[in-house]
From Swiss-Prot:
Regions of compositional bias (Polar residues) in chain numbering: 551-560
Positions carrying N6-acetyllysine: 50, 138, 144, 233, 517, 523, 573, 605, 723, 730, 736, 743
Name of this protein: Aconitate hydratase, mitochondrial
Region Disordered, residue ranges: 524-560
Family according to the record: Belongs to the aconitase/IPM isomerase family.
Organism of this sequence: Rattus norvegicus (Rat)
Keywords (A to Z) from UniProt: 4Fe-4S, Acetylation, Iron, Iron-sulfur, Lyase, Metal-binding, Mitochondrion, Phosphoprotein, Transit peptide, Tricarboxylic acid cycle
């Protein structure tokens, strides 16, 4: 623990000369800036090379690409214990990225730390708070008006603490990162679960909670459990209607939503070269849906081409020089290997209600009829951080153009979300946007929009059964439109476009015919489009705010009466005792994602106000006692009521509580609010069969106990009316289970074992009340 403590106590002095950023240490053979926006921050391939050589010599074996990049960023490569799936690594990420919904809490925590500046290059991206209603410009104007307080806070906090700020309308965080900040070999953390998008450019890009981002921005080594590595070998060539999206839809069907947990998915093999750089990004992006720590592709000519086209030929040239360190070693070993022949891969569509329910497009209509899913498609939606590249828009436009040539338009409503201002401006210039409008589409703002529930949908009523198809990444119940009866399917943008034209799930564009306006039948040809524009990208409007060199006079104000922002109060420390007689707030039945724990959509406006957003705590989770959402028994009054109200009652009356969950609890978004809220309302532990990686870490960061049943069947021993006592906290130690006494209302008791994954540093967080509390302790 000494190195951690030493670093924190020296932060105030060290940050003045930026000692903790990798770009400031040692000389280098070539000085190439990380980005155009940070000309004095350099890529350190020489340090990466040095660290890789140290680790390879220690381990005495070939390394995977994932290992090279991760171990190449070790804080102490000569002495760090390294064992896949077991040890915790202390890493030095190159940069941090935050989107506006998570940046609020991250920056509030950073302000609480008392530090003057961020220690690594960091950016804030305004993409989550723009609601889709009428179309791009109108929706953007409305969002700027409604969210002015939050945008002003983020802009001034960025200016004060040295964080770059991308204004609303600039685009989706992951597209901006790919266009400007990602590069081969980078280690980047982002406060969004789809940060792995950057793996399409050969980087290790990992989604985290805001508290993790605060550690990195503070210059503290970031902890990550040493990931296992799943190899996906690609052979053959993508062609026809089959797209990069189909690779990850197929992988999701194989590995399921938790099959990648604790692992990096590393794509390799001859088939890689048939996939564009942005296509590789699509595959890595949706790796979040299998629970993977991240996903990555090896550096190749496709990445070089993309870097050059986005104005970063100097980075491409430097990557060529260090190419041997940006690909896996021959003979490296994976923990698991999946092989996919791209020649045999068919277009896929996954859903509804879970992204791992995979179907070939040719079969989904038949399956839908059998299952009673609505066949008529109400809305087709393309775009999102997963599929909004120039190539995606071009392939969709190629499909739309064929329909227009035969006098057809979309039978379904159709929306288009450009991934960035650069993509929007370029597809406008090159005619793609107009083709998509002509076929019946509405171009939305450069933002997340309906993908995260920012959709003011008017065509149905809540509870109305319907089907939508999207090129998004997630299709959890109610995620896009807050309607639990919306059957959402995810597929490629070109398949979405074809299905929106046909209007039904029973249409297979590979084999089925459409009838043109003239009554003649025709078949859509497989789309073909340029992966990058033939001329340069059109950058569109300038939407970036540089942090000033001198920010000493910059104020960051938070009104005490604000309903959108709230300064944080420290959580209480552990009292040194076991947790006695914990009330069960809810025993959750089945899937419980972070959308169920802390809903997005209309709740996004409260992401900077912990008390207000806590009113959505677990409102989407199903209570096993009555099969209902947001209806739990108050153990004192015996009345059923909303989960947040019951939690507040317990907090007011000094009753500490626990949540019981099922498998893969907390899958999905990286939002740390799903951990902050239960802590704020008096929760002490979350006990489940298993956790999703990011959520488990977020819970630890906020001083909660994420615990798992040593015997998963013990889930069935606990009833919502029981009380639980957790023993062994005085001797809390890594690898040592805790005892849990189940106290039934009839006076009988049972004792079970609970496992945990805490290391010594994380146990310090628990004792201090949170990771932020511990940081402050070490500064004193």
């Amino acid at each position: 623990m000494a190195p951690y403590s030493l670093l924190v106590t020296r932060l105030q002095k060290a940050l003045g000369v930026r000692q903790y950023h990798v770009a400031s240490a040692l000389c280098q053979r070539a000085k190439v800036a990380m980005s155009h926006f940070e000309p004095s921050e350099y890529i350190r391939y020489d340090l990466l090379e040095k660290n890789i050589n140290i680790v390879r010599k220690r381990l005495n074996r070939p390394l995977t690409l994932s290992e090279k990049i991760v171990y190449g960023h070790l804080d102490d490569p000569a002495n760090q214990e390294i064992e896949r799936g077991k040890t915790y690594l202390r890493l030095r990420p190159d940069r941090v990225a935050m989107q506006d919904a998570t940046a609020q809490m991250a920056m509030l925590q950073f302000i609480s730390s008392g530090l003057p500046k961020v220690a690594v290059p960091s950016t804030i991206h305004c993409d989550h708070l723009i609601e889709a209603q009428l179309g791009g410009e109108k929706d953007l104007r409305r969002a700027k008006d409604i969210n002015q307080e939050v945008y002003n806070f983020l802009a001034t906090a960025g200016a004060k603490y040295g964080v770059g700020f991308w204004r609303p309308g600039s685009g989706i965080i992951h597209q901006i990162i790919l266009e400007n900040y990602a590069y081969p070999g980078v280690l980047l953390i982002g406060t969004d679960s789809h940060t792995p998008n950057g793996g399409g450019l050969g980087g290790i890009c990992i989604g985290v909670g805001g508290a993790d981002a605060v550690d990195v921005m503070a210059g503290i080594p970031w902890e990550l459990k040493c990931p296992k590595v799943i190899g996906v070998k690609l052979t053959g060539t993508l062609s026809g209607w089959t797209s990069p999206k189909d690779v990850i839809l197929k992988v999701a069907g194989i590995l399921t939503v938790k099959g990648g947990t604790g692992a990096i998915v590393e794509y390799h093999g001859p088939g890689v070269d048939s996939i564009s750089c942005t296509g590789m990004a699509t595959i890595c992006n949706m790796g979040a849906e299998i629970g993977a720590t991240t996903s990555v592709f090896p550096y190749n000519h496709r990445m070089k081409k993309y870097l050059s086209k986005t104005g970063r030929a100097d980075i491409a040239n430097l990557a060529e020089e260090f190419k041997d360190h940006l690909v896996p070693d021959p003979g490296c070993q994976y923990d698991q290997v999946i092989e996919i022949n791209l020649n045999e891969l068919k277009p896929h569509i996954n859903g509804p209600f879970t992204p791992d329910l995979a179907h070939p497009v040719a079969d989904v209509g038949t399956v839908a009829e059998k299952e009673g899913w609505p066949l008529d498609i109400r809305v087709g939606l393309i775009g999102s951080c997963t599929n909004s590249s120039y190539e995606d828009m071009g392939r969709s436009a190629a499909v739309a153009k064929q329909a227009l040539a035969h006098g057809l338009k979309c039978k379904s409503q159709f929306t288009i979300t450009p991934g960035s201002e650069q993509i929007r401006a370029t597809i406008e210039r090159d005619g793609y946007a107009q083709i998509l409008r002509d076929v019946g589409g509405i171009v939305l703002a450069n933002a997340c929009g309906p993908c995260i529930g920012q959709w003011d949908r008017k065509d149905i009523k809540k509870g109305e059964k319907n089907t939508i198809v999207t090129s998004y990444n997630r299709n959890f119940t109610g995620r896009n439109d807050a309607n639990p009866e919306t059957h959402a399917f995810v597929t490629s943008p070109e398949i979405v476009t074809a299905l929106a034209i046909a209007g039904t799930l029973k249409f297979n564009p590979e084999t089925d015919f459409l009838t043109g306006k003239d009554g003649k039948k025709f078949k859509l040809e497989a789309p073909d489009a340029d992966e990058l524009p033939r001329s340069d990208f059109d950058p569109g409007q300038d939407t970036y705010q540089h942090p000033p060199k001198d920010s000493s006079g910059q104020r960051v104000d938070v009104s005490p009466t604000s309903q959108r922002l709230q300064l944080l109060e420290p959580f209480d420390k552990w009292d040194g005792k076991d947790l006695e007689d914990l009330q069960i707030l809810i025993k959750v039945k089945g899937k419980c994602t972070t959308d169920h724990i802390s809903a997005a959509g209309p709740w996004l406006k409260f992401r900077g106000h912990l008390d207000n957003i806590s009113n959505n705590l677990l409102i989407g989770a199903i209570n096993i006692e009555n099969g209902k959402a947001n209806s739990v028994r108050n153990a004192v009054t015996q009345e059923f009521g909303p989960v947040p109200d019951t939690a507040r009652y317990y907090k007011k009356h000094g009753i500490r509580w626990v949540v019981i969950g099922d498998e893969n609890y907390g899958e999905g978004s990286s939002r740390e609010h799903a951990a902050l809220e239960p802590r704020h309302l008096g929760g002490r532990a979350i006990i489940t069969k298993s956790f999703a990686r990011i959520h488990e870490t977020n819970l630890k960061k906020q001083g909660l106990l994420p615990l798992t049943f040593a015997d998963p069947s013990d889930y069935n021993k606990i009833h919502p009316v029981d009380k639980l006592t957790i023993q062994g906290l005085k001797d809390f130690a890594p690898g040592k289970p805790l005892n849990c006494i189940i106290k039934h209302p009839n006076g009988t008791q049972e004792t079970i074992l609970l496992n945990h994954t805490f290391n010594e540093t994380q146990i310090e967080w628990f004792r201090a009340g949170s990771a932020l509390n511990r940081m402050k302790e070490l500064q004193q």
